[in-house]
């Protein structure tokens, strides 16, 4: 059994992060899509099929599959009562020792899960393709500090601007998800300008802000993942695993077979 799977099933304090590919080619087969969709609760199925674009449907489906798979592993039960906070952050009712956060990216979805008493966590995926030209910098001026704006503006080429912006954005959204407010929060309240984006081939970059530990890493050349948790739990050393959608689907099917 892999380290992350053993940890997720254990009762010991831990933090596990799972990232899953959004396998568009697999879901071009209508049978594969419908089979995976039927694994979800009916209410979730309705939310998935309400999406207009096929890619958005697939992303929503993958998000829910990963949420179901991860939370069932952690809580060792099929009977999970999910609900949402005021600003839409999902959580599990009637549990104080488990929390999680979800994010959708361009080609991936991710979840961070913490088996810790009354502990918030946050996570976000950001793509360099969200920043298409140097002119975009002006559009995002309201969410960047003066120092962040200048650092991006001073990059020597567009690709470096895109990567730095994606890094800043992922940290900011991760933090607001940690707070449970998402995009309803003020993205300027956290200033990331003192930190550099991790290198593409770097395993993980770790830094602290506001007594919170952040981990950032590129999951592809285009997408960066950032997740966070209270700095007091640094000793836990979170485990991050990248899964494929087929293994998650099979995992859901067989989770509680005897």
Swiss-Prot record:
It is an enzyme of class 2 (transferase). It holds the Pfam family ACPS. GO terms for cellular component: cytosol. The keyword DNA repair does not apply. Its EC number is 2.7.8.7. Keywords: Transferase. Coiled coil: none annotated. It catalyses: apo-[ACP] + CoA = holo-[ACP] + adenosine 3',5'-bisphosphate + H(+). One of its GO terms (biological process) is lysine biosynthetic process via aminoadipic acid. Catalyzes the transfer of a 4'-phosphopantetheine moiety from coenzyme A to a serine residue of acceptor proteins, such as alpha-aminoadipate reductase. Necessary for alpha-aminoadipate reductase activity. One of its GO terms (molecular function) is holo-[acyl-carrier-protein] synthase activity. It comes from the Eukaryota. Disulfide bonds: none annotated. InterPro entries: 4-PPantetheinyl_Trfase_dom, 4-PPantetheinyl_Trfase_dom_sf, P-Pant_transferase_sf. The keyword Ligase does not apply. This is L-aminoadipate-semialdehyde dehydrogenase-phosphopantetheinyl transferase. Belongs to the P-Pant transferase superfamily. AcpS family.
